[in-house]
């Protein structure tokens, strides 16, 4: 890219991150300064929400750039949780954006040490057959980041013990959508637990559903009884 194109692309990413922060508040997935958002810029750096800022007050110029080597650029310091954002983006080339929230039901479950098991087929939208819960570690610590990587593995979401939830995606829209889905699943699972014994789906069925989700909503989704006849009837 030329210098002008690179600058424009960076501006668009910052604007998208600001919009995502505000959307988290609008969707009631976070409150005050809790939680954080990041979006990949390139193979060695990413933009991340600034530390200690109320989401409704974040401006484009507040969004710092952070390199994987720990150097940051901008007028506001990066979120205190920068370590797990960096380590996840570095470990997972398929991930373009990360959302961390303290949404009510997901956090409540995390405070019991529970994850979200295969009680509903939508759990597989994370790319795995369960949503695991990482053990508690102090926020912002390398220990927490290490626990997150060990827990999330190939999934796109996990809970954080006594803390909150992480959701990831190819872009900010996907990460936001998944954060909302995890919160919805957490609420449903909490309600199911209150009703009594919860029936679980087996691993074979969950992996089958996870595979279907890989092409869900796409024109080339696999369905033996459907064939695409063209763009117009």
Predicted regions and their residues:
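Glycine-rich flexible loops
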Residues: 1-233
